[in-house]
Every structure is written in structure tokens, then in C-alpha cells.
Amino acid sequence: MKKQKSGLYEKSLIRIILFLCINFIHFPLYGYYFKNIGVKDGLSQPSILSIHQDELGRMWFGTLQGLSIYDGNEMITLKGGEERFDNYIKNNTIYRIVEDSNHNIFLRADNSLVCYKLTEDRFQCIRERDINAVNSIGGKIYIAAKDSILEWNEGDNRWDFFKKIEISSGRISSIFCNRSSEWYIVTSKGCYKEYKNGLWKCILDIPSIEMLYESKDGSIWMATRSNGLYQFDNDICVNHIVNNPGTANSLCSNDVRVVTEDQSGNLWIGTREGLNKYSISTGNIESYASGGFSGDMKHSSIFALYLDKEGGLWVGTYYGGVSVFSPESRIFKYYPANKERSDCLNFPFVSGIVKDKRDDLWICTDGGGLNYMNHKTEIFRHLSTKDSGLVADNMKSICYDKNKDKLWFIRHFE
């Protein structure tokens, strides 16, 4: 049984290393394990547009066709207000999920807004049309309706006028307020900021801004549909992060949909072609995408990101459901192939791996001979027919005899 388990482990490790070597441009030195939740687990639909965690710790997923709620083990069904639920949520697109200071949940379902009363377990539609944007700011709920911002008055169960947007800039698609109580809106013509004199000024005239996000250092990040990610400090663009084809330190795509920050201050960027981790302090970028292997995201096109109370990052994809992982926990390390470097393999195709009694690794390759890695220093020694007396570089399998401390190989015969 031990031998069988060891063989399974080695085969899994081989698959991981093969996958990483083939995809070395898109993957970082260290990796994460993603847990995936899909339709087979009870999701109403595999396209996730919004994610939120409520006061009870449950995860809410807004999809193209309705709402799903996950308690950590399974999807659950809320029973209150079935008629309202069916009319406004079931089969509708849930674009946004936010929460007020009383822990009520607000859902933008198509162009209506539905409130879920947590203490009453009841749904209530509080506006049936003309919802262009919704946000929770300071525990209060605000919506953009035509050329105005309205504030929800829960005590009187009504919408109160908050402010008029005195600009002719098209439909408002997003409303935002930073920690300095400065207001921003996004329209089809760009991002506008309100100044103390009540005037609105365009600070980024790009017509495809997806969202605004404020990081812990006070920077405002603007995700765009085709122009990458912009960083603003004091209304000045100080950084523009884009996709540079063929470059490792690059965004997966210039189509950026969503941004959030983890507990360590790293920025996570969801794009149309994968997930990026951006170090604000160093400028380093790591990339993650679906590769079809166990532990990967199921889909690379990302629409939603959410950091939960325990620090887990939830990723909503276009057609792969939800993926969740811990940004603070790495489970594997990637060793690329570069025969000129002692910290790399000398050949990208790995056919077998064994560990000797000193815990060092012996890795046979299908074309590069044998690689030995010291587990303490992580330095490789490359052994091939040219410099070590091996009879072949095309090795198909490797076995270790612990009693005799010897290696056995199966090689390819021409």
C-alpha cells in the first residue's frame, strides 16, 4: 500500500511539474491550490458576477441566472418571501451584492434592487427599475438613478435625494466614495470626482471603466475594459499597469474587471484571461490561469473577487463557477527549465521523480538526462551523456533502492 501511495504521489508531482514547465511564462515560482465550486455543488449557474459574505459567514453568489448561497458545506435555500424571490431574483442577473450597517443584504437584480432582511429572513423589492449602480458607503446604501444619487432611508422605507450630478456625461454606471469622503462616479465618458465647490471634474476620460477601488495606502485604482489598470494618488495618475505580450511581469489581459487587496497588502486583479497578483511595494506581477489540472481555477475569465473574513479569496469566473484559495498559503514551488542556471531543471519534460534517504530529489527527463536537487540548498546538478557518463538522455522512468542507495532507470532505445 505504501508503494502504491508513493507511486500516486510521484505521478501527481510529475503532472504538476510538467504542467508548470510547459506554462512557465504564465505561472509564478510559487503556486496556490484552488477549491472549485460549480453547478454540481448546487450553484444556480456557472457564471459568477458578484460575491459577498454576510454576517453569518455565508457566501452569496450572484449569477447570470439567479442567486446561490453557500454555508461552507452546501448550497442553502432561503425560504422567506418566495413570491418576491421568484419575481425579482430567480433567473435574473445579479450584478451586485452589498450590505448595510444592520447587516441587511441588497442585490441589484437586473435593473431592480432587492433587500434581504437578515433578522426577518425576508426579501423585499425596494426599487423595481432604473437602478444603474448601487454601493454601500459608510454602512448606508446609495444608488445611481438617472442623473441623481439617492440614499435608502430604512426607518421610513423610502429613497431620499442625496445629490444631483451636474454633468452631461451619460448614464452613471458606478458610484464610489473614498475614506476621505470624496465622491466619484463613472459614466460612459470616464471617471468624475466631486470637488468642494460642488463641481465635478473628469480625472480619467476613458469610456470603459469597470470599477474603482481604494487600497490601504489611499490609492484609487481604476479597472478598465481595454486599457489595463490605473493608479491615482491625489487625482494624478502615478501608475499604469498593462499587458505586455511575451513579458513575465505583465497583466494577463488589458480587460480588467475587478480588483481587491489581501491581508498582506497585495493587489489581486481579475481580468478576462486570468488572475494577477500585484505587489504594490515592488511592482512584481504574478499570473494565474486555468490549465485543466486539479487545483487550478476552472475558468480564466474573472468577473468577481471577494476577500472573506478569514482572509480567503473567492474568485467568480465567467463559466467555471467559483474558485477559492488562501493568498497566505502556498502549496507548491515551480522550478523552470534553464540549463544555464543551477536553480533550474536542464530540460522541461519530466518523466520521473524519486526521493533518496537524504531527502534529496532525483528527476529524470525525456531528453535532458538526470537532474539532482539538494533539498537544503535547492541547487540542481545536471547529469547528461555529455558530462556524466550516462548512456542515454531520454529517460522514461526512475526507481530508488533505499537499502542499496542506488538508482535504476528505464531509458528509450532507438
Language-model features, listed with the residues they occupy:
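Carboxylate-rich, polar loop motifs that coordinate divalent cations or form catalytic acidic clusters
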Residues: M1-E414
